């Protein structure tokens, strides 16, 4: 543990860690080699100074090296948010995932239970009847047979159990809130990632580029949402062809009307499940619009759409034809057929 002590000593003087040093430190934490006080010191030193792209890249590499992997097609996408935006909104990325799958792009969705809302991806999917506590092989079967699978983070990241108690005791946001969405167990290289703060939009796109992502959008809504919002502009860093570009988009760019963030307020898992099913059943609402907008971006990332308007049109077709709703039914059936 001398290496860990020297790393904490470096951080105490304000020195930033190299990618390799960060990977080594996070490997030690997730292997159970670091003590709780050492972990707390490192996490808070990074939080207070602000984590660098190299430090996050190393930490994600360590987390990915320990995860239980899932087999998925090369063109699979993930639509995921960091959570922790404090909005308590409906489950946008989860709903968008079924739309994307309904439009013909395989989805390897990674998620967890609620962080700051009453209902995270795992909560709402369980309420809809999806079996979430299945093995990596069974998730792979879901993706193959249903075109969408859900990877429940605790199942695929068992090493996180060594860090969990320290995170709970710190009771504040740490680098781990950023690592989960970047550590997809299916190894997807096409990601739509929502973040809780604008400051992370460009850096996380750079991290994904460092780690070999082919195509990605990292987004933050101007109203604070860790998704693309319909209440105003959304800040985007897009990775394509090895280059990162930053820009803003609005609902109007996709041909969608604006709506206040308040209309996207969610409830508990059961209430959010009813709302999500309503969108899949073709009911018009602001929830449908925001899900379509996020699905459109994911379809661009997945190489299926060229513009947001094109993506919205494909997503609307997936909803109105019943294809998106069929994906949920298939996921429920295949996941529950698991032993």
Swiss-Prot record:
EC number: 2.4.2.18
Coiled-coil segments on the chain, per record: none
UniProt-annotated binding residues for 5-phospho-alpha-D-ribose 1-diphosphate: 81, 84-85, 89, 91-94, 109-117, 121
Cofactor(s) needed by this chain: Mg(2+)
The UniProt record lists the keyword Magnesium: yes
UniProt-recorded Gene Ontology molecular function terms: anthranilate phosphoribosyltransferase activity; magnesium ion binding
Metal-binding found in the keyword field: yes
Keyword entries, A-Z: Amino-acid biosynthesis, Aromatic amino acid biosynthesis, Glycosyltransferase, Magnesium, Metal-binding, Transferase, Tryptophan biosynthesis
SUPFAM superfamilies registered for this protein in UniProt: Nucleoside phosphorylase/phosphoribosyltransferase catalytic domain, Nucleoside phosphorylase/phosphoribosyltransferase N-terminal domain
Pfam name, any one: Glycos_transf_3
Residues that bind anthranilate 2: 167
Free-text cofactor note: Binds 2 magnesium ions per monomer.
Leader sequence segment: none
Major enzyme class: transferase
Pathway where this protein functions: Amino-acid biosynthesis; L-tryptophan biosynthesis; L-tryptophan from chorismate: step 2/5
UniProt family annotation: Belongs to the anthranilate phosphoribosyltransferase family.
Cited function: Catalyzes the transfer of the phosphoribosyl group of 5-phosphorylribose-1-pyrophosphate (PRPP) to anthranilate to yield N-(5'-phosphoribosyl)-anthranilate (PRA).
Name of the featured protein: Anthranilate phosphoribosyltransferase
Organism (species): Rhodopseudomonas palustris (strain BisB18)
């Amino acid at each position: 543990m001398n290496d860990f002590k020297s790393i904490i000593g470096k951080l105490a003087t304000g020195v930033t860690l190299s990618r390799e040093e960060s990977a080594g430190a996070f490997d030690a934490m997730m292997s159970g080699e670091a003590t709780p006080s050492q972990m707390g010191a490192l996490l808070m030193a990074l939080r207070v100074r602000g984590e660098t792209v190299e430090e996050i890249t190393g930490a994600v590499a360590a987390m990915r090296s320990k995860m239980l992997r899932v087999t998925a097609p090369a063109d699979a996408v993930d639509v995921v948010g960091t959570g922790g935006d404090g909005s308590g909104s409906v489950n946008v990325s989860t709903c968008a995932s079924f739309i994307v799958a309904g439009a013909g792009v395989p989805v390897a969705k990674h998620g967890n239970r609620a962080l700051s809302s009453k209902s995270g991806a795992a909560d709402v999917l369980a309420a809809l009847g999806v079996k979430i506590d299945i093995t990596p092989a069974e998730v792979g079967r879901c993706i193959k047979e249903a075109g969408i699978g859900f990877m429940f983070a605790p199942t695929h990241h068992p090493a996180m159990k060594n860090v969990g108690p320290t995170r709970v005791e710190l009771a504040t946001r740490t680098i781990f809130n950023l690592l989960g969405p970047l550590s997809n167990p299916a190894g997807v290289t096409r990601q739509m990632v929502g973040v809780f703060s604008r400051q992370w939009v460009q850096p996380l796109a750079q991290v994904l580029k460092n780690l070999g992502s082919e195509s990605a959008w990292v987004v933050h809504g101007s109203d604070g949402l860790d998704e693309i919002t319909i209440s105003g502009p959304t800040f985007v860093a897009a990775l394509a062809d090895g280059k990162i570009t930053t820009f803003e988009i609005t609902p109007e760019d996709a041909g969608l009307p604006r709506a206040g963030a308040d209309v996207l307020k969610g409830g508990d898992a059961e209430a959010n499940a009813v709302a999500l099913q309503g969108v899949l059943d073709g009911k018009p609402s602001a929830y449908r619009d925001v899900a379509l907008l996020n699905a459109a971006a994911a379809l661009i990332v997945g190489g299926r759409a060229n513009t947001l308007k094109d993506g919205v049109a494909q997503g609307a077709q997936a909803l109105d034809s019943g294809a998106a709703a069929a994906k949920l039914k298939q996921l429920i059936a295949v996941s529950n057929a698991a032993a």
